[in-house]
Amino acid sequence: MTNTRKSHPLIKIVNHSFIDLPTPSNISAWWNFGSLLGVCLGLQILTGLFLAMHYTADTTTAFSSVTHICRDVNYGWLIRYMHANGASMFFIFLYFHIGRGIYYGSYTFMDTWNIGILLLFAVMATAFMGYVLPWGQMSFWGATVITNLLSAIPYIGPTLVEWIWGGFSVDKATLTRFFAFHFILPFIITAMVMIHLLFLHETGSNNPSGMNSDSDKIPFHPYYTIKDILGVLFMMIMLMSLVMFTPDLLGDPDNYTPANPLNTPPHIKPEWYFLFAYAILRSIPNKLGGVLALVSSILILMLFPITHLSKQRSMSFRPFSQCLMWLLVANLFILTWIGGQPVEHPFIIIGQLASMTYLFTILILMPSTALMENKLLKW
């Protein structure tokens, strides 16, 4: 009799993906973030579902319904803060995951990499729309400012913005459709994750050396299932510490003031995980130029497979490229800091320099350093 795990049409898919999957024997903890992102997505869908049971997508009652969830619903405060801080964890792991992909040359799996970038856009869109739902001051003004950027698109811009708003300003129609999209997108993301994994399992995982590991593979279970569970344990400790001790640490105090179209907050800014892109947007004193720079700051990831000129896949044995990688990370920290600062001297010039360095490092410095390393190694 054949093993059900290997013969059942449904179970064998799970078996080939998570149990008998041949995995490189040397993958480090940097490979844990994929599974952590999966857990985060599941957690967000679950907590989001319970929040949606009590939330009302109406401008007059949205803010009150969130207050009601926190005060009157059993463990509503816990669900709400797990959802809000879960989004922060999601983005931390997402950036680690992308950083690992850049460092170890995982972007050479073109299909997996490109669907990953589309996933990033989908997650960013979901998070942005979710931030609008509590209908606080920063929700309202953030929605107004960011959607207004589309008016920079030539010819169709202004019409497009009014079409998205469902009127002449951010109002009831906007909130309702944002809730609808915020609810449906995570399920679309789940489907995209499956495609992401499908492409990954066609090639097999990369490893820290960047070399072919076909000669040294081990089954995913139990070796990496136990490793992933440990990662999830660390993640839950981090998330629950944040939720229980400082739930509002990463939020904005302005969002505890109900939305008021007649009163603009002194500094309109998005959640911390968008600040680097927001800083790049603000560093160009032209509306269309800023929007193009904003989109380019993410789309530039698609160029990594093209600008990879090194004969080695991974950065493990390329010290000069490693220095540039960490320069890029430091640069992103500077951009994140600048994105949260007011538009005044010296922050303007720092933001412009950091934005320029970001693009220059990826487009010029990294490829030219790779060529130099090839020469040094007589390749």
Swiss-Prot record:
More about this protein: Heme 1 (or BL or b562) is low-potential and absorbs at about 562 nm, and heme 2 (or BH or b566) is high-potential and absorbs at about 566 nm.
InterPro entries xrefs: Cyt_b/b6_C, Cyt_b/b6_C_sf, Cyt_b/b6_N, Cytb/b6-like_sf, Cytochrome_b, Cytochrome_b_C_euk/bac, Cytochrome_b_N_euk/bac, Di-haem_cyt_TM
Cofactor(s) required for function per UniProt: heme b
Comment on bound cofactor: Binds 2 heme b groups non-covalently.
Name listed for the protein in its UniProt record: Cytochrome b
Gene, per the UniProt record: MT-CYB
Membrane-spanning ranges: 33-53, 77-98, 113-133, 178-198, 226-246, 288-308, 320-340, 347-367
GO molecular function: metal ion binding; ubiquinol-cytochrome-c reductase activity
UniProt record similarity statement: Belongs to the cytochrome b family.
